[in-house]
Amino acid sequence: KKLEPGTSLPSERFSLMQQLTERGITVIVNLAPILPFINDDMENIQGLLSYCVKAGVYGILTDKMCPVLREGNRERFYQQLYKNFPDIYDQYEAVYADEKTLKTKNYTEIMACIRETCEAHGIQYDKEELLRFTREYKNKTIGTQLSLFDMM
């Protein structure tokens, strides 16, 4: 929320996921970004996965989990980081100064937790399978104008 002002809270996203799945709408969550030293602790990851399980999501994508800082957004990211998280700014500089990809030190543990949770609850996490699903998903609303507000 601090780095991306205006974004909805996880609890708000959970509420929307529940509303969608209750209406039979397939939900795939893109679990990203996972930011080192900010939201990469296992308690946070397990909390996010718990939301997904409770909401009954179809799948969880993780291929964009590690942010890639390209020219332009790198400067903005570090400005926001310094402004909102000055206590960890130096850690980022020390660990990620020359890195484009912000891969958390917990990456392997996080991926294992995601895999175990998905397998235990029948949630799809294979990227290729999720992409295949989205390509083959039959649009049952052709010719119908939808509004997100009709669902609330």
Residue ranges and their predicted role:
Residues 78-152:
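C-terminal accessory extensions appended to soluble enzyme cores
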Residues 1-92, 99:
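Conserved AdoMet/S-adenosylmethionine-binding subsite of the radical SAM
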